[in-house]
């Protein structure tokens, strides 16, 4: 086994490359003598930077090209941000490892103001996420939410150029890229419930490659896997993707799991919430239970409106 090479499919963004290098280092540490190389590529989501993700429509905007590389044997594993991974996989592929989660919170970044509450009336806030927009506008309906796409460096540069009073980014990405000092304040999960899987890195590979599954085993983090499993079950039951106003966050409490879920109108003012506590061994069922509770409260109408505006999913 030590003589073979593992090829990692990855996007070319700085954060994606960091994640791939992290997996590479972990594999080499766990399996001395194993050769690991990167296969960088550009996804559709990386190319379509002039439109909000919610307007592009479709799922798997950041993973499809990587999955094609796996299916065509141009790579052996693909490394993803879990919040970008669709709920269903192409035949022959599957998720076989979830690494330990980084800080899952959203980060408030500003050169002028200390926190969201400190923003003056009518301030311009940049985000590419309908999930963040729904929660921001419910809390602060006076804010102007402006479209913000691009990699982390690009988004920070736009803030520094004065295009925004503040921007909201995932804390995990800033921390991983060495920009932790740019986090003005972390937004609590009570004020901005994260996206399912936010802060976690997942590894996809061919279902038939049992030898690779064994190599990935030391990288798998059980607690993160249980939490993300519950979050993804909620997302799947709501037919969610990475560009819809769905939030969910699970934490472990001993042998139990506490899952909170949210669906919000991107225009603000209508946040539907639900939560459940139960045995962590029932993670998938708990996710479905919270999703159904949200649907019972009217989440379907909000999501249908968003899907209609985005085009086919």
UniProtKB/Swiss-Prot annotation:
Keywords: Porphyrin biosynthesis, Transferase. Binds 1 dipyrromethane group covalently. Pathway: Porphyrin-containing compound metabolism; protoporphyrin-IX biosynthesis; coproporphyrinogen-III from 5-aminolevulinate: step 2/4. InterPro entries: HemC, Porphobilin_deaminase_cofac_BS, Porphobilin_deaminase_N, Porphobilinogen_deaminase_C, Porphobilinogen_deaminase_C_sf. It comes from the Bacteria. GO terms for biological process: protoporphyrinogen IX biosynthetic process. GO terms for cellular component: cytoplasm. The modification S-(dipyrrolylmethanemethyl)cysteine is found at residue 242. It is an enzyme of class 2 (transferase). GO terms for molecular function: hydroxymethylbilane synthase activity. It catalyses: 4 porphobilinogen + H2O = hydroxymethylbilane + 4 NH4(+). The porphobilinogen subunits are added to the dipyrromethane group. NCBIfam families: hemC. Belongs to the HMBS family. Tetrapolymerization of the monopyrrole PBG into the hydroxymethylbilane pre-uroporphyrinogen in several discrete steps. This is Porphobilinogen deaminase. The gene is hemC.
